[in-house]
């Protein structure tokens, strides 16, 4: 079996991706020849400054090119099966500051394309393709992502509404190269999570832990983060997307270290994302209350991962996570009543308010999930993937239990749900904040492959935290 690094020595499979997108085009728009046109992200300047903004490549363009250059374009002639990449021409003034750019011959060696030209040749190439199809071809591009100077002269029509949707659908199922990229992002992020655990031993502030994570990612080849890291100690962990990362790890009143810290962070490798969450003890060992909640969440995750295979209904997996949570919270005495009644009344949503997971790829919340944020059923409202999971998809499995006063207190005050929550028992758990455990899982025909190897068994985590 080829190793990740061996696979990634090859070219990113841009041509195969172009053909995959073309299948959607031909299925929905048979007849006239189709031509796909995409542009990369532009270099943008920071306002009131002569520095460029951080560059993030447009994902549709990368999916069909594998190219990270700004100011580039591509054309895919579907019937001719010809993929042409256009890269910036040499700008003598820019060479002074940044050195020579990539040449067309060098680009041919790097990318899985049939031809490489420079961007001044885009319009002539489009006109030539339109002429070859006798004016019957239709150009497909993305609204708002085409330069004013780009012309589709000679085409029967230019459609700006369909292409993005086709690409988003195509991206759901990953090929072996994409799985290798996701695994590489996970491998780097695992090293960073371990570094963060070790940094927490002596850290006094959340930002020190964040710094250790980011530094380790950069040192191992993931210069960008998949998203802004979440480093949330104590009750901060009850905020799902806690943004601050600047709280002291010692309680200002008790002068004691807080019980635990939630770290939700992942590095990005060649545009592909890792998204991993771990909770670690700040005192070396988990406090009793944290340990109890951690055991429930880990059980939720393990049972849900075991359900994964081609065609599984994600709604069912999400619902199962809630049933495991209800059972665990009943055993602790936080909830009271029957499991079925608590499930039907959606009481567990007070403690597990988000969806079980989302597709993962070039975006952290990747395309193709078809969520229904208007769902009147609050258990499923924030589930980012609805429907059956296909083999080849990669999904996060990230159950959690949180003690967020803003979310839970309305349940306590409601005449309909207050009887199900024992507030005396609940009082002991506010300081836990939140526990979430998140892995990135590749769905296969008969099961799954967990791409995440960051430690999550409590004994393993404690051995690193001591």
From Swiss-Prot:
How does the cofactor bind to this protein, according to its record?
A: Binds 2 manganese ions per subunit.
Q: Which GO terms describe its molecular function?
A: manganese ion binding; metalloaminopeptidase activity
The alphabetized UniProt keywords are: Aminopeptidase, Hydrolase, Manganese, Metal-binding, Metalloprotease, Protease
Residues that, per the record, bind Mn(2+) 1: 275, 398, 438
Cofactor(s) recorded for this entry are:
Mn(2+)
Catalytic activity annotation: Release of any N-terminal amino acid, including proline, that is linked to proline, even from a dipeptide or tripeptide
Binding, Mn(2+) 2: 264, 275, 438
Which InterPro entries does the protein's record reference?
Aminopep_P_N, Creatin/AminoP/Spt16_N, Creatinase/aminopeptidase-like, Pept_M24, X-Pro_dipept-like
Q: Which Pfam families match?
A: AMP_N, Peptidase_M24
What GO biological process term is on the record, naming one? proteolysis
Q: Does the keyword Hydrolase apply?
A: yes
Annotated EC: 3.4.11.9
- Does the entry feature the keyword Protease, yes or no? yes
According to its UniProt record, which protein family does this protein belong to?
Belongs to the peptidase M24B family.
Task: Sum up the protein's function in the record's words.
Answer: Catalyzes the removal of a penultimate prolyl residue from the N-termini of peptides.
The protein here is known as: Probable Xaa-Pro aminopeptidase pepP
Organism of provenance? Aspergillus terreus (strain NIH 2624 / FGSC A1156)
Gene expressing this chain:
pepP
């Amino acid at each position: 079996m080829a190793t990740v690094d061996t696979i990634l020595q090859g070219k990113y499979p841009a041509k195969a991706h172009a053909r995959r997108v073309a299948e959607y085009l031909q299925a929905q728009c048979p007849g006239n020849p189709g031509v796909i046109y995409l542009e990369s992200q532009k270099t943008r300047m920071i306002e009131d400054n002569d520095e460029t903004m951080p560059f993030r490549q447009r994902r549709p363009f990368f999916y069909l090119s594998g190219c990270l250059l700004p100011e580039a374009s591509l054309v895919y002639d579907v019937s001719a099966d010809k993929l042409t990449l256009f890269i910036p021409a040499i700008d003598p003034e820019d060479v002074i500051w940044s050195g020579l750019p990539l040449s067309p011959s060098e680009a041919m060696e790097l990318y899985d394309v049939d031809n490489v030209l420079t961007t001044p040749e885009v319009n002539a190439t489009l006109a030539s393709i339109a002429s070859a199809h006798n004016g019957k071809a239709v150009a497909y591009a993305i609204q708002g992502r085409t330069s004013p100077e780009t012309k589709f002269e000679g085409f029967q029509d230019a459609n700006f509404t369909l292409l993005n949707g086709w690409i988003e659908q195509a991206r759901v199922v990953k090929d072996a190269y994409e799985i290798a990229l996701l695994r590489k992002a996970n491998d780097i992020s695992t090293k960073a999570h371990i570094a963060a655990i070790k940094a927490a031993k002596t850290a006094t502030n959340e930002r020190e832990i964040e710094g250790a994570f980011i530094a380790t990612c950069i040192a191992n080849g993931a210069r960008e983060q998949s998203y802004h890291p979440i480093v949330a100690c104590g009750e901060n962990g009850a905020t799902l997307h806690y943004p601050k990362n600047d709280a002291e790890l010692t309680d200002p009143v008790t002068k004691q270290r807080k019980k635990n810290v939630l770290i939700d962070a992942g590095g990005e490798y060649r545009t592909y994302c890792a998204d991993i969450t771990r909770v670690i003890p700040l005192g070396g060992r988990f406090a009793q209350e944290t340990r109890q909640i951690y055991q429930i969440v880990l059980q939720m995750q393990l049972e849900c991962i075991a359900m994964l295979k081609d065609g599984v209904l994600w709604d069912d997996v999400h619902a199962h996570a809630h049933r495991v949570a209800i059972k665990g919270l009943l055993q602790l005495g936080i909830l009271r009543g029957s499991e079925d009644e608590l499930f039907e009344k959606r009481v567990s949503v007070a403690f597990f308010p988000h969806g079980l997971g989302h597709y993962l790829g070039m975006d952290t919340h990747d395309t193709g999930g078809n969520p229904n944020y208007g769902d009147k059923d609050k258990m499923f409202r924030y589930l980012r993937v609805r429907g059956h999971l296909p083999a080849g998809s990669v999904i996060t499995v990230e159950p959690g239990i949180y003690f967020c006063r803003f979310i839970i207190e309305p349940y306590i005050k409601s005449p309909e749900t207050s009887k199900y929550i024992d507030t005396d028992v609940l009082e002991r758990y506010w300081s836990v904040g939140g526990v979430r455990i998140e892995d990135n899982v590749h769905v296969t025909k008969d099961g799954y492959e967990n791409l995440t190897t960051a430690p999550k068994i409590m004994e393993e985590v404690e051995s690193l935290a001591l």
